[in-house]
Amino acid sequence: MRLFYAVFLPEEVRAALVEAQTKVRPFRGWKPVPPHQLHLTLLFLGERPEEELPDYLALGHRLARLEAPFRARLRGTGYFPNEGTPRVWFAKAEAEGFLRLAEGLRAGVEELLGEEAVRIPGWDKPFKPHITLARRKAPAPRVPPVLFGLEWPVEGFALVRSELKPKGPVYTVLEKFSLRGEHGREQAQGPGERPEGD
């Protein structure tokens, strides 16, 4: 099964991204990502045996207990690669929380898989939080940058299965993980104290 961890977006952010996609719709070479599939990938796992699924679910729950909700910012658009012929048009996202989640997931997967983790496609690439807006399928021009300046609360992430179909990938959310930040609360309360409401 083809798996990845991702953050999905609230309606107001998704609406702004869909509006930005109108910039590339006149050009048939660009294929916009369907609105319901817009997301920020935290870690791509590639094709994994189904028997490993419980480990990835447990990792998500463990990290969600440690990390607190945070606010993220949507900046402007960019291209991968930045020079030469672009393949991907994306929106840049910013938040230390994205980096913490990505690093925590990566460390957990390394612990689970050991040296095998380096065989995951893209494992050696640095994490750059972004939301893919469109992919270039044929010759098409670059479009002027779009600036957003939006903020939104990130309260969780998900483990997602991706099935590749002739018309494009189909995503299925296998599990959602709500950020609870228990580790940070325990540190603030001191030893022996229990969080309120637990």
UniProtKB/Swiss-Prot annotation:
Q: Mind telling me which InterPro entries this protein's record contains?
A: Cyclic_Pdiesterase, Phosphoesterase_HXTX, RNA_CPDase
Molecular function (GO) terms listed?
2',3'-cyclic-nucleotide 3'-phosphodiesterase activity; RNA 2',3'-cyclic 3'-phosphodiesterase activity
What positions does the record give for the motif labelled HXTX 2? 130-133
Q: Where is this motif: HXTX 1?
A: 39-42
Broadest EC class?
A: hydrolase
Quickly give the catalysed reaction: a 3'-end 2',3'-cyclophospho-ribonucleotide-RNA + H2O = a 3'-end 2'-phospho-ribonucleotide-RNA + H(+)
Catalytic residues (UniProt): 39 (proton donor), 130 (proton acceptor)
- A matching Pfam family: LigT_PEase
Q: Which domain of life is it from?
A: Bacteria
Per the UniProt record, which EC number(s) apply here? Answer: 3.1.4.58
- Sections of the chain in a coiled coil: none
Keyword list, A-Z: Hydrolase
What does the UniProt record say this protein does?
Answer: Hydrolyzes RNA 2',3'-cyclic phosphodiester to an RNA 2'-phosphomonoester.
Against PANTHER family, the record matches this protein to: RNA 2',3'-CYCLIC PHOSPHODIESTERASE (PTHR35561:SF1)
The entry assigns this protein to a family as follows: Belongs to the 2H phosphoesterase superfamily. ThpR family.
Q: What is this protein called?
A: RNA 2',3'-cyclic phosphodiesterase
